[in-house]
Amino acid sequence: MRANCSSSSACPANSSEEELPVGLEVHGNLELVFTVVSTVMMGLLMFSLGCSVEIRKLWSHIRRPWGIAVGLLCQFGLMPFTAYLLAISFSLKPVQAIAVLIMGCCPGGTISNIFTFWVDGDMDLSISMTTCSTVAALGMMPLCIYLYTWSWSLQQNLTIPYQNIGITLVCLTIPVAFGVYVNYRWPKQSKIILKIGAVVGGVLLLVVAVAGVVLAKGSWNSDITLLTISFIFPLIGHVTGFLLALFTHQSWQRCRTISLETGAQNIQMCITMLQLSFTAEHLVQMLSFPLAYGLFQLIDGFLIVAAYQTYKRRLKNKHGKKNSGCTEVCHTRKSTSSRETNAFLEVNEEGAITPGPPGPMDCHRALEPVGHITSCE
């Protein structure tokens, strides 16, 4: 597609033979590491997370796609609009504004699936949203970029990475399909695979984050504005996604899922599109943003998970104390009731085995209750 590029720093034509400057000499290593590790991570994660998907629930989301519709509205409605507002509000340079907008137009990433699992979200909805947003990106990415850049005076060919989108779909759907099959055939074993996959996925996320920071240290620039946007952008996505899901009367489980899906973007797709569309000279100014965004969305995700697990643990301890107190009271009351019941039965037995016809006093004594039988509700 065609977008416009402005100002005195007009974007020159792409040059595949141009050598990268020192600031981006990690280009080859970074691309190789992120491609290989991300592909392996995606395959392992989606297979293990696919073991948590039930065909019945997945089909219900497809038949009544209200949650998916809300998620797509957040993904291709709120995120591109937020990116546009941030680019305008911070008065970014043209190439930097394009980088922010491309990030906002990208589909959701698989990182949201592992975070959704850790916050007890709706895994069926999470995987459905990731798949549907990736498919929708084939048309929504060029449409959103065109709508938000038609008034900008930039002159640059933006290449939509359709091949990358296709690879993402393959790496997403095939492992999930195998995971769903394993969960259908061997439900007990799938629970073990799911737990192992969650741990391995967390470790791989940390490895990718550290590797990205270390390998791309030469590409970080000192533009505090881009770093600020990369910090607040995923937070805005999480908050607005949660509020929109809450406004549309989704369950708390779905609200957490949609929130994480909205703020987590496909970083690899954004980097690929920038590399295909811009020269090395402009990548120096642009590549730091998706890398910083990826780092901050990891940090935000871990903070959300930590906050949820802390809240969950405190709530569990609170209910545990209440239950233990009730158990003690119930045990005491049951012990007292048992003794009173035995005494009551002993009195009746004495009255029952007394020979001869019962007199008035005997009848009164036999019918007189000795204690009150209580129960704990």
Curated annotation (Swiss-Prot):
Subcellular localization, as worded in the UniProt entry: Membrane
Post-translational modification: Glycosylated.
GO function terms (MF aspect): bile acid:sodium symporter activity; sodium-dependent organic anion transmembrane transporter activity
One Gene Ontology CC term in the entry: plasma membrane
Glycosylated residues in this chain: N4, N157
Chain ranges on the Cytoplasmic side, renumbered to this chain: 51-67, 119-133, 181-195, 248-266, 312-377
Biological process terms in GO annotation: bile acid and bile salt transport; sodium-dependent organic anion transport; transmembrane transport
Segments in the Extracellular topological domain: 1-29, 89-97, 155-159, 217-226, 286-290
Membrane-spanning residues: 30-50, 68-88, 98-118, 134-154, 160-180, 196-216, 227-247, 267-285, 291-311
Record has Transmembrane helix as a keyword: yes
Keywords per UniProt: Glycoprotein, Ion transport, Lipid transport, Membrane, Sodium, Sodium transport, Symport, Transmembrane, Transmembrane helix, Transport
Top-level taxon: Eukaryota
Record flagged with keyword Transport: yes
InterPro entries: BilAc:Na_symport/Acr3, Bilac:Na_transpt, Na+/solute_symporter_sf
Family (UniProt): Belongs to the bile acid:sodium symporter (BASS) (TC 2.A.28) family.
PANTHER family membership: SODIUM-BILE ACID COTRANSPORTER (PTHR10361), SODIUM-DEPENDENT ORGANIC ANION TRANSPORTER (PTHR10361:SF55)
Note: In humans, 3-beta-sulfooxy-androst-5-en-17-one (DHEAS) is the most abundant circulating steroid sulfate in the human body, it is mainly synthesized from adrenal glands and gonads, whereas rats and mice have low circulating concentrations of DHEAS in the periphery as they can only produce DHEAS in their gonads.
Name the UniProt record assigns to this protein: Sodium-dependent organic anion transporter
